[in-house]
Amino acid sequence: MQRLHEFGLLRASFLPKGEIAALRAYLRQRERLVELAASHIQHMQKALMQMNVQVHHVVSDIMGVTGLRILRAIVTGERDPGVLAANRDRRCRADVETIQRALTGNWRAEHLFALEQALALYDACQEKVADCDKKIEATLKRIEAQSAKPVGELPPARSTKRQPNAVDFDVRTALHAVLGVDLTQIHGLGPSLALKLVGECGTDLSAWPSAKHFTSWLGLAPHNKISGGKVLSSRTRRSGNRAASLLRLAAVTVGRTDTALGAFYRRLSARVGKAKAVTATARKIAVLFYNALRHGMDYADPGASYYEERYQQRVLANLQRRAKSLGYVLQQADIAPAAVGVS
């Protein structure tokens, strides 16, 4: 192996360097902290249920404004359901009476202790997540200073809804300044997911000569097993690639949209199943991601109707080709509407 590598016959593995390696480390640390905070939320919900306090059933997000106010009041010693329900935020859908009925519990000391500890650990995780956000923002600014890519005008955002557990700064603007393109214009890629992809793959994709090399590295391309000139299997190989997992999440999201990628996912899902449709759609998103970073290509979605029209054209061309090979000619039939008799 060493001899082959010495003569340049082996392709090097991809390892991020410099600031990209630091960005990836900060993002992975932040992800671990978010997962840890989620486990502490579950501990709080368990403590509330053991005290028969069902506030998490009437408040959509227990870690929202209303939920946190109530939890902090309980931890500081408040037990009156009326006083606790008065912490309701005006945007909360449940009324004060509903919240008050859900705040009648047994208030056992051991469960209150577990609730207090879980809340303290959750707050500690949030503080560490905020520290990670500062490190990530500073790293992106250093990468921007090293970048020589021309930056045009940032296009309007497709969605202004804030994602849960999003970083505490404008990711779209920061990534656009670094990359020169807006990755969030690709359907399925939100700001947080685009940031994680850049952290895993870097800003320079020249390590992969083509999009086919890139999708093969991700484990999203068919892994053909050939014996005697015959393809025995073309299943994708098993891979623990984090970027591939992110792209699969994007594929599931885009499958619910009225876009060309969404129409492709739904048509393939009905034919070969959801698992293969997710992989195939993830591969398409990976190609768009590669072309955007490597060649600076902007993505404009043609829409689901355009995809369906192109699909019908391909089916018709295939039928015409098969008919011609058999000595027939396809002719469009004028089908008159059926007459409806009235008795």
Language-model segments: what does each one mean?
Residues 1-343:
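A detector of single, family-specific signature residues
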